[in-house]
Regions:
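Intrinsic disorder/low-complexity segments
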Residues: 5-7, 37, 152-154
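Short acidic/polar mixed-charge low-complexity motifs
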Residues: 1-2, 13, 111
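Nucleic acid-binding interface residues in structured DNA/RNA-binding domains
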Residues: 50-158
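Short beta-strand scaffold segments in enzyme catalytic cores
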Residues: 2-5, 119-120
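Compact structured core domains
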Residues: 9-55
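Residues in well-ordered beta-strands of folded domains
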Residues: 4, 20, 145
């Protein structure tokens, strides 16, 4: 998986503001600064070990609703999933379109993997990823889910 990492200085402190998956054929560039390089190293470690803990300074920008969705996503254990509707119910949202709005908040997440939006799925399938429901990004989501599920299955063996 190829990624692009965006950083920004906030009051003199560098922060990660975005992580984006790139198409397989995309050319990659060297990280633009030390923080981006650190982020890429941690993402590469995650690829080898889904237990990797990220210790990156993040700038998380979003509405109060989005932040609540993202907090719930961060509480989903590795190897587990919740549906968009389950996340909505955890938030106390009962409107008929609540699952769709949760899906929008998942798609608006600019820090995938670090804020694990891939752990939120549709009631009848994998759902979307980064505002798309097909193509290489859905393959990335499937890979992330399988990567984490395999790690759990391996750990549960006697």
């Amino acid at each position: 998986m190829k990624v692009a990492v965006a950083t920004r200085d906030v009051n003199g402190n560098p922060c990660i503001v975005g992580i984006r998956y790139l198409p397989p054929a995309a050319e990659t560039k060297a990280p633009v600064n030390e923080l981006a390089e650190r982020a890429v190293r941690q993402l590469e470690r995650y690829r080898e070990d889904p237990d990797t803990k990220f210790d990156l300074p993040l700038l998380i920008e979003g509405t109060d609703f989005q932040r609540r969705v993202w907090e719930i996503m961060c509480a989903i254990p590795r190897g587990r999933t919740l549906t968009y509707g389950e996340v909505a119910r955890k938030m106390g949202e009962g409107a008929s379109d609540a699952a769709r709005v949760v899906g929008q908040a998942c798609g608006d997440n600019k820090l995938p993997i670090v804020i694990p939006c891939h752990r939120v799925v549709g009631a009848d399938g994998v759902g979307g990823f980064s505002h798309t429901t097909d193509g290489y990004l859905i393959e990335v989501k499937r890979w992330l889910l399988m990567h984490e599920a395999r790690a759990d299955a391996f750990e549960l063996r006697p």
